[in-house]
Amino acid sequence: MMTMQNFRVRSIKEDDINEWFRLRKLLWDESSDAEHKAEMLDIYEHTDSQLVLFAETEDGKLVGFLEASIRPFVEDCHSDHVGYLEGWFVEPDYRQYGIGRKLVRSAEIWARNKGCEEMASDSEIGNDLSFKAHLNLGYEETSRLVHLRKDLV
């Protein structure tokens, strides 16, 4: 049986790229491979304002990840330097062991060390699992937003 002690949270290493790609595709399956690779390159080149963390089991398997950033503006926040949870994911077989919580707490410490006084995130309307996970970690709903578009051609 897995326990909270059977994994560790660590920063990205160069040889994590393939596993990072695999985990990203599980979280954001609507993005193309090219979009993932472009975003990953951008994140990897801006480690001053971007963070990637992994949850690694004792046997070296990456079972979760988190991406965070520092944003100059976030809706409904009071400061202009905000830590932002871009996304986090834990493989289904490894959920309910505190892995997501530890990933998020590690990102919050990183943001605090970067001078942030607030941490923010988002969750798509209808993604109840994500919304409840945020609430369980102490985040509060500030607003709901639906994006709209129209072709002008």
Region roles according to the model:
Residues 7-20:
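A short beta-loop-alpha structural element at the N-terminal edge
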Residues 31-54:
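Active-site rim helix/loop that mediates acceptor-substrate recognition in acyltransferases
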Residues 54, 61-70, 84, 89:
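Conserved beta-strand in the GNAT
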Residues 72-85, 95, 142-143:
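A conserved beta-turn-beta hairpin within the catalytic core of GNAT-like acetyltransferases
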Residues 90, 96-109, 136:
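Conserved acetyl-CoA-binding loop-helix of GNAT-fold acetyltransferases
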Residues 101, 113, 125-143:
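Conserved active-site alpha-helix within GNAT-family acetyltransferase domains
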Residues 104, 111-123:
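Conserved GNAT acetyl-CoA-binding A-motif
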